[in-house]
From Swiss-Prot:
The modification Phosphoserine is found at S10, S14. CDD domains: SNARE_syntaxin1, SynN. This is Syntaxin-1B. PANTHER family: SYNTAXIN, SYNTAXIN-1B. One of its GO terms (cellular component) is nuclear membrane. Residues 29-104 form a coiled coil. The chain crosses the membrane at residues 265-288. GO terms for biological process: calcium-ion regulated exocytosis; exocytic insertion of neurotransmitter receptor to postsynaptic membrane; insulin secretion; intracellular protein transport; positive regulation of excitatory postsynaptic potential; positive regulation of neurotransmitter secretion; protein sumoylation; regulation of synaptic vesicle priming. It is a single-pass type IV membrane protein. Residues 191-253 form the t-SNARE coiled-coil homology domain.
Length: 288
C-alpha cells in the first residue's frame, strides 16, 4: 500500500499557509479601517474648526480694536487647522503610496478596490473642507480690506482698489498713513483700526501661503481621481436601476404566473363541470 503520509502533511502545511495569509489580510484590513476612522475624525474636527474660525472672524470684525484673547484664539485655531490638515495629508499620502505599490505588482483584489474607494472618498471630503477654509480666509481678507478703505476715507484719504492691493502686497502701510494729520480722536481711531486690519491681513496671507502647496497637491489628486469616482457612481446608479428593474420584472412574472395559474384552474373546473353534464346527458339517454 502506498504511503501517503508525506502528501497529507504537505496538504496540511499548504492549508495552514492559506489560513495564515487569510488572517494576515483580515488584520491588515482591520488596521486600514482604523486608519479610515481616524482620518474621518480629523476631517470632522477640521470642519468644526473652520466653523469656529468664521465666528472668530465675525467677532474681530465687530470690534474696531479686538481684544488680545479673541485674536489669540483665532491664532490657536489657525495653528490647529494647519497641524490637523498636515496630519490628514500625510496619512492620505501613505495610503496612496500603498495602493500604487500593489498596482505596480499588478495585484487586483476586492480589498484593493475598497481601499481605493475609501481613499478617494476621504480625499474629496478633505479637499471640500480645505476649500471652505480657503474661501473663509479669502472672504475675511476682503472684509478687512474694505474696513481699511473705509477708515482711510474717514481720514480724508481716498484710494482705488488697485492702490490698496499694491499697498497690501508691499506691506508698506506708511505710504497711506504717514502724511495723515492726527488732528482728531476719530482720525486716531481710524488709524488704529487700519493698522489692526492690516496686521490681520498679514497673518492671513502667511497662513494661506503655508497651506497653498498642500491645497494644490490634494486638489490635483482629487481631480485625477474624478473620472474613477464618476465611473463608480455610474456603475452603482446603474446597478440600482438594474436591481429595481429586476424586482419589477419579477413582480410582473409572479403576477402573470398567478393569472395563468388561475386560468388553468378555471379551465379544469369548466372541463369537470362539462364532463359531469355530458355524463348526466348520456346516462339519461341510455335510460330512455
Amino acid at each position: 500500500m502506498k504511503d501517503r503520509t508525506q502528501e497529507l502533511r504537505s496538504a496540511k502545511d499548504s492549508d495552514d499557509e492559506e489560513e495564515v495569509v487569510h488572517v494576515d489580510r483580515d488584520h491588515f484590513m482591520d488596521e486600514f479601517f482604523e486608519q479610515v476612522e481616524e482620518i474621518r475624525g480629523c476631517i470632522e474636527k477640521l470642519s468644526e474648526d473652520v466653523e469656529q474660525v468664521k465666528k472668530q472672524h465675525s467677532a474681530i470684525l465687530a470690534a474696531p480694536n479686538p481684544d488680545e484673547k479673541t485674536k489669540q484664539e483665532l491664532e490657536d485655531l489657525t495653528t490647529d487647522i494647519k497641524k490637523t490638515a498636515n496630519k490628514v495629508r500625510s496619512k492620505l499620502k501613505a495610503i496612496e503610496q500603498s495602493i500604487e505599490q500593489e498596482e505596480g505588482l499588478n495585484r487586483s483584489s476586492a480589498d484593493l478596490r475598497i481601499r481605493k474607494t475609501q481613499h478617494s472618498t476621504l480625499s474629496r471630503k478633505f479637499v471640500e473642507v480645505m476649500t471652505e477654509y480657503n474661501a473663509t480666509q479669502s472672504k475675511y481678507r476682503d472684509r478687512c480690506k474694505d474696513r481699511i478703505q473705509r477708515q482711510l476715507e474717514i481720514t480724508g484719504r481716498t484710494t482705488t482698489n488697485e492702490e490698496l492691493e499694491d499697498m497690501l502686497e508691499s506691506g508698506k502701510l506708511a505710504i497711506f498713513t504717514d502724511d495723515i494729520k492726527m488732528d482728531s480722536q476719530m482720525t486716531k481711531q481710524a488709524l488704529n483700526e487700519i493698522e489692526t486690519r492690516h496686521n490681520e491681513i498679514i497673518k492671513l496671507e502667511t497662513s494661506i501661503r503655508e497651506l497653498h502647496d498642500m491645497f494644490v497637491d490634494m486638489a490635483m489628486l482629487v481631480e485625477s481621481q474624478g473620472e474613477m469616482i464618476d465611473r463608480i457612481e455610474y456603475n452603482v446608479e446603474h446597478s440600482v436601476d438594474y436591481v429595481e428593474r429586476a424586482v419589477s420584472d419579477t413582480k410582473k412574472a409572479v403576477k402573470y404566473q398567478s393569472k395563468a395559474r388561475r386560468k388553468k384552474i378555471m379551465i379544469i373546473i369548466c372541463c369537470v363541470v362539462l364532463g359531469v353534464v355530458l355524463a348526466s346527458s348520456i346516462g339519461g339517454t341510455l335510460g330512455l
